């Protein structure tokens, strides 16, 4: 699928927007209208290597996608890579770019694309996937804008079974 780009201008400092976007545990707060069953795959939900798995609820082609934060350039860019579809055979890419605008506003630009190699996957994408993703990501950025500008707290995704009591490394234990 060719890249899909969505943009929004948010009335918040770039550092605040970056911190929110770079934390995968916050994603369901503004993407739950098209993404379901969101699971963190690693306990730290921020930083390079943080990962999540979720289901894209597209009627014509529901699929699971795994995304991993591949590169961070605070507070400018978050680059994610992943795989999705049947047997995780479709490479998936997401790039968040944040630019400072006058008056402490931030322009958020999100680019999303997939690289299907299997003929069945390419055929499914011809059934309106690009338009569908563009509309969903545009709405997600509007919801992100509303959430950040309102300053209301969001329900973060937690890792099931995470140890609530920090454990000490074996070298420190006696």
List each model region and its residues.
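Hydrophobic pocket/interface hotspot
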Residues: 17-21, 27, 52-54, 69, ...
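Hydrophobic/aromatic beta-strand elements that line small-molecule binding cavities or substrate pockets
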Residues: 6-8, 39-40, 56, 64-71, ...
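Short glycine/serine/proline-enriched coil/turn segments at secondary-structure junctions
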Residues: 46, 59-61, 86-90
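Hydrophobic ligand-binding cavity/cleft-lining segments
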Residues: 1-44, 163-174
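A short, structured loop/turn motif at beta-sheet edges
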Residues: 14-15, 43-46, 70-76, 97-107
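Intrinsic-disorder/low-complexity, polar/charged segments enriched in Ser/Thr/Lys/Arg/Asp/Glu/Gln
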Residues: 1-9, 15, 51, 64, ...
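Short, flexible loop/turn segments with low-complexity composition
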Residues: 153-165
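Beta-strand/loop substructures that line and gate deep hydrophobic ligand-binding cavities in soluble
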Residues: 81-139, 146, 155-157
